[in-house]
Every structure is written in C-alpha cells, then in structure tokens.
Amino acid sequence: MQCVTPNWIRVVNAARRTWGKKPIDHEPSDKFKKKILLAEHSPIRLLEYDFTIENLRQWVTVHLVRHHEGCEKFVHTQRQDINSEVEVITKRLIEVLQEEGLLREGWKERDYMFQGEGNDMDMTCNAQAFINISRKRLCMGCTSPETRLAWKLVIDALREVDSILAEKCVPECVYRGFCPETDRCCGYVNTEAYQERLKEYRSIE
C-alpha cells in the first residue's frame, strides 16, 4: 500500500485553514488524527492510499466496486481479446459443453466465464472511503466471508502504513455502538471482545 498524497500534513493544514490558522510543516499529533477521523470532518478526504488486491474472486470484485464515494477501482478486464488466460479457460469449457450437448443458444464465449475465477484489481481510497467501506465489508452477519476476508487483508495492509486510520476502520456495530441488522445479527455485540473493540475505537488517547 502506498500513500499518494503528502500524508497527514495536508489534512491538518486544510483543517487549520478552516480556523484561519497558518499551515505547519510537520505531522499532527496522534490525538488530532484520532479526533478528526472520529468526527469525519472533510479534510480527511485529502488522505489517500493506493493498493492492489491480487487473485480475488471475480464475484468479490463486484462487491467492492459497488462502493463509489471517495474511491476508484480498476479491475482486470475479462475480455477474451485482451486477457488471453481467460480466453484459454473459456474455450476449453465450451469444448466440453459442446461435447455434452449443453451449449446454450445465443450465448457467447464471455457468457461462460466463471465468476469464481481469480482476478486482480487496484483501488484508490481516501480516509472517508476506508471508514465507509469497512462499516459494510467487515460486518460478520451480512458480508460474505470471502469479501470480509479480502477487505480485512486490505485493512491489515493499511495498518502497516497508517495504524490510526486502520484502528478507525470498523464494522457497522462498532461504528454505531449497536447492531442495526436485527434479523441477521451475528451476536458479536454481546461479547466482551466487542466492548473492548468499542472502547479502542472511541479512544482519542
């Protein structure tokens, strides 16, 4: 994962501008970072990270590309005229189906591609996007295990370069202080681990 903007200095100086203060040339304190992330004030949108996810199931990429605020996604195409690996797999499948008389009328080669095939994607997210996506994709009750694991790995990578932002990337129940998914609650909110996570998330120390 790579930071693509001048780190937290840009964030703090944008915040200082709104208060009519002069810019500074050093990173703000950890306490400032935690407070502004919890408050979700607009300057946090200036903090952006690029990352790559490799060998991700195609249908999982579909889950991630639904998010559109504060992020951009670039997924490896499945077009056979560009992706030769996909072309080989698809043609072999069609040969087998043809032998068994299972080809569907009107279908093209691309219609036979597996959604479980591994694919690669790049993403750019600002801090607000990380927070928003985590609320949905870290949920243990409503998110598929595969998508949750993929996003957890993203947050683990983020933690290596920005541990404070990663700390504020939590599932919906931690973010809101209760589980709003009354029909699909996983029970995490009833555990001591949840209370500890909630305390950690809300801390500015």
Located regions from the model:
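Family-specific signature for flavin-dependent thymidylate synthase
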Residues: M1-E205
